[in-house]
């Protein structure tokens, strides 16, 4: 079964080989909230969602955060453990209004459009398992996405910053 977000962009043979090295979750259904944590549901249970926290400082300073493929080689294995959350086909409930979509590099390892919440791009940690504690938090890098998290200001907004 092909995931709808991958079917919309044809994969070249080379890109298909690159993608096969990294598992891609295709069983994502809807959003849910557990406590204050935003999660995505799967047939086996919910998975926690994460945000990349350095993005806020980059946006406030007018800088661009590169895709993982553009990072130094020694950082890629760490970054590839986080999968950009694909745009979900249908989302219901009170938090659907905060969802958005951002395009990604169509030539990269993860070419699908990415789901955002309050402007924050959302990520899955590839080693998390439904029903178990979240394992992908890394202080000052990846934090659990909370429903009360202030929205990420658009790039170039005046009046924000350190």
Residue ranges of predicted features:
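Compact beta-sheet-dominated domain cores in extracellular/mature segments
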Residues: 1-162
């Amino acid at each position: 079964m092909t995931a709808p977000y991958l079917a919309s962009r044809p994969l070249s043979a080379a890109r298909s080989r690159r993608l096969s090295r990294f598992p891609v979750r295709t069983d994502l259904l809807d959003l849910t909230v557990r406590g204050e944590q935003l999660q995505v549901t799967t047939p086996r249970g919910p998975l926690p969602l994460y945000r990349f926290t350095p993005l806020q400082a980059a946006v406030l300073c007018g800088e661009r955060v590169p895709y993982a493929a553009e990072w130094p080689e020694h950082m890629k294995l760490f970054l590839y453990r986080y999968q950009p959350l694909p745009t979900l086909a249908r989302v219901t409930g009170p938090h659907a209004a905060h969802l958005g979509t951002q395009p990604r590099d169509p030539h990269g390892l993860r070419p699908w459009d990415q789901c955002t919440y309050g402007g924050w791009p959302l990520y899955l940690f590839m080693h998390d398992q439904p029903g178990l504690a979240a394992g992908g938090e890394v202080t000052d890098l990846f934090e659990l996405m909370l429903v009360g998290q202030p929205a990420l200001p658009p790039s170039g907004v005046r009046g924000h910053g350190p």
